[in-house]
């Protein structure tokens, strides 16, 4: 058989290919580092106090807003302090987004993709109160109304986006103890999450109803400042991200078609590794598909969930591929039968599948529900927060364990090849030079695989922590840089692109000759290959299994059986 392109490509051509791919990798890092802004931005919005309109208090089509024609009657902090009841049930906390800048009205762009809101709460107790420390897991009931309007709409033309009465649990500490009151500040609480940023302006009305019969919000003194942190994806980063996807998508599709065409030209059924390469390329193509362009014209609140599903499919396929890739090159089998998922890898891949399904269930339990209720969050209850944190920690530990196991498998591959290499001195010079060249190329590819796996696992763990840092209580700050994101994304494409090229079947046709003449000619070709990088590796005559895709595999298995 003719083997793979990795085996038959000349040293100079292989160097040009590897150099070109490394240059593309550097460009991906520079694209994010020099041209893209940080992936996400945030704005802190201090809530305005508006006096409640009791006649329309239960009308969900009525909204109070602080800027523009027809704005609400605002209440000062002094008026609240002077009232004996602190204006209970008479105040609405209003957040109008985005904030103006330099007297210019700003609006959200659909390029910003999504919007997440978290709330910082401060409240006070009279110093005469016996309560000095608020109870832990303090339950707060909030009437939330989220509205929107678009550019060109009148200032009062707010339309309801979502409404709900939700519970949040606070963990607070005393920030200032004064002679008249004690001020408490609380950890940030998740408020809402929008999977699509389709409209120009958003308005949030928050009410904290006091109800004695229902024991609602009676444990609080009175509200002080409320600060909403609105987090969104930066539009400039989305431009760069979609440009990268648009450029990479046709290249991956083209190389997949080319690869599978070469496989089907062979007079054998595709090997397991060839099937896995095709599935991996398909998962990458699905990830590369720039569906985000549709969100610029169509409101797609499920885009965040869809992005998580696409990335989850890719992670599952990539992790599975690495196990099969390393396993196929460990080259230790009890028989020379063709490898299958069921016969060799079902235990390894079952663990990957179970882990990915668990993460999918966790994701759908939050973002799936948010399609109907954007105020829902699994982090809002103490039990839910512990479960969510446990999932994040478990995902990080599992990723680290997977990487260590992959390192173990690759170390066994190197050990096995080292053991088989002891048989090289007994071979002819031509055959020894041939296999030494193949082993060198193979080791380089395995080290590149290990580097790709390390960056992937690091990116996964940092991504999980960055997503949860606004929702947990620890003071942990994780910032994924644009250069890291575009670099890792480009690395996935370049790595899989290289594998599809290097593991594609080589269709070089070698002349048919008698055994003695064939061996002489083969020796001459290989010695010439060692002397000149222009001459390509040629296959040594062997009785290798026609199902093998690599003569290195054939060599090591042959030695193993002997």
Swiss-Prot record:
Domain of life, source organism: Eukaryota
The keyword rRNA processing is annotated on this UniProt entry: no
Keywords from the UniProt entry: Cell membrane, Cell projection, Developmental protein, Endoplasmic reticulum, Endosome, Glycoprotein, Golgi apparatus, Membrane, Postsynaptic cell membrane, Segmentation polarity protein, Synapse, Transmembrane, Transmembrane helix, Wnt signaling pathway
Membrane topology: Multi-pass membrane protein
Subunit details: Interacts with wg; in the Golgi. Interacts with Vps35, a component of the retromer complex; wls stability is regulated by Vps35.
Job description of the protein: A segment polarity gene required for wingless (wg)-dependent patterning processes, acting in both wg-sending cells and wg-target cells. In non-neuronal cells wls directs wg secretion. The wls traffic loop encompasses the Golgi, the cell surface, an endocytic compartment and a retrograde route leading back to the Golgi, and involves clathrin-mediated endocytosis and the retromer complex (a conserved protein complex consisting of Vps35 and Vps26). In neuronal cells (the larval motorneuron NMJ), the wg signal moves across the synapse via the release of wls-containing exosome-like vesicles.
Similarity remark: Belongs to the wntless family.
Protein name in UniProt: Protein wntless
Source species: Drosophila pseudoobscura pseudoobscura
């Amino acid at each position: 058989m003719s083997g793979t392109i990795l085996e038959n490509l000349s040293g100079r051509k292989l160097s040009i290919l590897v150099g070109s791919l490394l240059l593309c990798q550097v460009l991906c890092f520079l694209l994010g580092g020099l041209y893209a802004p940080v992936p996400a931005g945030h704005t802190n919005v201090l809530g305005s106090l508006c006096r409640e309109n009791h006649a329309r208090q239960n009308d969900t089509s009525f909204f109070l807003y602080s800027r523009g024609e027809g704005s609400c009657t605002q209440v000062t902090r002094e008026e609240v302090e002077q009232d004996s009841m602190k204006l209970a049930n008479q105040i609405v906390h209003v957040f109008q987004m985005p904030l103006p800048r330099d007297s210019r009205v700003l609006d959200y762009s659909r390029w910003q993709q999504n919007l997440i809101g978290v709330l910082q709460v401060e409240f006070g107790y009279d110093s005469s109160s016996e309560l000095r420390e608020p109870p832990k897991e303090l339950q707060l009931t909030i009437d939330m109304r989220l509205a929107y309007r678009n550019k060109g709409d009148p200032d009062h033309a707010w339309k309801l986006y979502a409404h709900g009465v939700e519970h949040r649990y606070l963990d607070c500490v005393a920030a200032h103890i004064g002679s008249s009151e004690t001020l408490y500040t609380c950890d940030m609480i998740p408020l809402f999450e929008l999977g699509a940023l389709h409209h120009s302006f958003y308005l949030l009305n928050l009410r904290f109803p006091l109800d004695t019969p229902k024991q609602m919000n009676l444990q609080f003194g009175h509200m002080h400042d409320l600060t909403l942190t609105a987090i969104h994806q930066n539009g400039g980063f989305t431009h760069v991200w979609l440009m990268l996807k648009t450029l990479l998508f046709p290249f991956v599709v083209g190389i997949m078609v080319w690869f599978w065409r070469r496989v089907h030209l062979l007079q054998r059924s595709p090997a397991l590794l060839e099937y896995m390469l095709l599935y991996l390329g398909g998962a990458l193509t699905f990830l590369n598909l720039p569906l985000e362009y549709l969100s610029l014209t169509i409101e797609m609140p499920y885009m965040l969930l869809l992005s998580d599903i696409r990335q989850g499919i890719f992670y599952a396929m990539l992790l599975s591929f690495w196990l099969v890739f390393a396993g196929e090159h460990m080259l230790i089998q009890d028989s020379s039968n063709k490898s299958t998922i069921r016969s060799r890898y079902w235990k390894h891949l079952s663990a990957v599948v179970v882990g990915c399904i668990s993460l999918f269930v966790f994701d759908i339990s939050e973002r799936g529900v948010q399609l109907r209720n954007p105020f829902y969050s699994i982090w809002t209850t103490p039990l839910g927060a512990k479960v969510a944190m446990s999932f994040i920690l478990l995902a990080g530990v599992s990723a680290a364990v997977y990487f260590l196991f992959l390192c173990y498998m690759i170390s066994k591959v190197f050990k096995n090849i080292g053991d088989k290499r002891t048989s090289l001195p007994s071979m002819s010079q031509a055959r020894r030079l041939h296999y030494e060249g193949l082993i060198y190329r193979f080791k380089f590819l395995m080290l590149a695989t290990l580097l790709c796996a390390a960056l992937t696992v690091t990116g996964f763990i940092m991504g999980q922590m960055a997503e949860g840092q606004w929702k947990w209580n620890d003071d942990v700050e994780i910032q994924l840089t644009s250069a890291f994101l575009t670099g890792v994304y480009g690395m996935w494409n370049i790595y899989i692109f290289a594998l599809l090229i290097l593991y594609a079947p080589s269709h070089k046709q070698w002349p048919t000759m008698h055994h003695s003449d064939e061996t002489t000619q083969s020796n001459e070709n290989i010695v010439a290959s060692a002397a000149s990088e222009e001459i390509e590796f040629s296959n040594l005559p062997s009785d290798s299994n026609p199902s093998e895709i690599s003569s290195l595999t054939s060599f090591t298995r042959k030695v193993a059986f002997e």
